[in-house]
A protein has these predicted regions:
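Glycine-rich loop-to-alpha-helix module at the N-terminal edge of alpha/beta enzyme cores
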Residues: 54-136
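Short beta-strands and strand-loop turn motifs
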Residues: 56-59, 205-209
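Active-site and channel-lining beta-strand-loop segments
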Residues: 37-57
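Single conserved hydrophobic/aromatic residue that forms the stacking wall/gate
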Residues: 261, 265-268
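PLP-dependent aspartate aminotransferase-fold enzymes
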Residues: 100-202
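Active-site-adjacent loop/helix segments that line or gate small-molecule/cofactor pockets in enzymes
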Residues: 2-41
Length: 268
């Protein structure tokens, strides 16, 4: 059994300065009835805590560390860029080069707006969908997490398809009612909800592989059904690939389900 004496001490100190001692609820370890472990360094597939215990890292910082920790090629690239400055508050050619690489990897992408978090990405996508369609309703799926977006922090009530109820204090009920949550991979639940709200349906948002409930993949037939119905209805289908992009495959989870009709060059 590992000893985490220093982690416990650091946790008590952190609680003096941060609510709950952490900056993200998932780091609190409350779901497993434990205390957070404080890490101090990482190398390759391993992370080391403040007590110098060594762990195999199966999380990878929730996705981005796919090349391992302290990868020498990454360290060199970061160090080289640091010599040129850290932030300009203005455009740089690196943005365009990065966008071009991303577009080459994910052919469904036509244009890119870069943001600092998954929450900003989903919030912007929802706002754009509502603005473009001039509709209000959003369909999401149980177990899919899309960040700290007010309209998406909801859970479903009883029944196969219900209007959302606020899942966190501070979210107005009227706002939550614009979001309907359906059971993941349940075609009947989706179709029932879709028929009820399609005239005011701006978008359907989904994690093609639901990370927060055990990495359950959406079935190909289910995901294709979402594409088919949203296209017919002129609603937007949003794939939240914050966790799956470039990891499940270079083209993201959407590449693994092989939808040619997700491609940007699709013709009717």
């Amino acid at each position: 059994m590992y000893k985490i004496k220093k982690s416990l001490k650091l946790f008590e100190e952190a609680k003096l300065h941060m609510p709950g001692g952490v900056n993200s609820p998932v780091r609190a370890f409350k779901n497993i009835d434990g205390n957070p472990i404080f890490f101090s360094k990482a190398k390759g597939p391993y992370v080391f805590d403040a007590d110098d215990n060594k762990y195999i890292d199966y999380i990878g910082s929730w996705g981005p560390m796919i090349l391992g920790h302290s990868n020498p090629n990454i360290i060199r690239a970061i160090s080289k860029q640091l010599q040129l400055g850290t932030s300009y508050g203005a455009p740089t050619n690196l943005e365009s080069k990065t966008a071009e690489i991303i577009k080459d990897c994910v052919p469904s992408i036509e244009k890119i707006r870069m943001v600092n978090s998954g929450t900003e990405a989903t919030m912007s996508a929802i706002r754009l969908a509502r603005g473009f369609t001039k509709r209000n309703k959003i369909i999401k799926f149980d177990g899919c997490y899309h960040g700290h977006v007010d309209s998406l922090l909801i859970k479903a009530g009883s029944g196969v398809s219900t209007f959302g109820l606020p899942d966190s204090p501070g979210i107005p009920k009227q706002l939550a009612k614009q979001t309907i949550s359906c059971e993941f991979n349940n075609k009947d639940a989706f179709l029932e909800t879709f028929e009820n709200v399609k005239n005011d349906l701006a978008a359907v948002i989904i994690e093609p592989i639901a990370g927060n409930m055990g990495f359950i993949p959406g079935t190909k037939s289910f995901l294709n059904l979402l594409r088919k119905k949203t296209k017919e209805n002129n609603s937007i289908l949003i794939f939240d690939e914050v966790m799956t992009g470039f990891r499940v495959s270079l083209g993201g989870a959407q590449e693994t389900v092989s939808y040619t009709h997700l491609r940007a060059h699709e013709t009717n």
